[in-house]
Amino acid sequence: MSFFPIVGRLVVMTTLFAMAAHTAHAKKPDKDADILGIWTLTKVLDSADIASLTDQQAAALVGKVLVVRRDSVMFNGDPCRAPGLTRRRQDAAKYVREGYHARVGGLGLPDIVTVVDLDCTEAFLKEREKIVVFWQGYFYDAVRRPQAKR
């Protein structure tokens, strides 16, 4: 009987155990990864029937930044309270019509949209790396800034 087959099996078993333990402790995807980050407003899409900004004031916010973290939201340097980041799936046309007295047509949202509560406003998940942000009566397209490589 050779000593090496036993050692070989022991090495294989140890490796398999280590891989299983690593997989079990691997970081799970963050359920809020689709909303967390730094977002830049790129375009005014539409407005609600009642807005607290003029069209010119709304246009001046294009290029401004929305920062969404798990414990805070900041828009254009102004902080909101800690967000709940609660989300719900809604019929986009009905939700925008009833909640904002606006039409969904120009927003480019899917028929069923995920709405995320950011405390001081709401964001609508549009597509990967794109959201629609509602701010003081206006809807904006926003894109996520790429994360810096480490």
Where is each model-derived feature located?
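C-terminal segment of classical bacterial N-terminal signal peptides
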Residues: 17-25
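Bacterial N-terminal signal peptides that target proteins for export
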Residues: 1-12
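N-terminal helix-cap/turn-to-beta initiation motif at the start of protein domains
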Residues: 26-40
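Residue-level signal for WD-repeat beta-propeller blades
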Residues: 33, 60, 67, 125-126
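Short, solvent-exposed mixed-charge patches
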Residues: 27, 148-150
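Short, exposed beta-strand-loop hairpins at the edges of beta-sheets
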Residues: 121-143
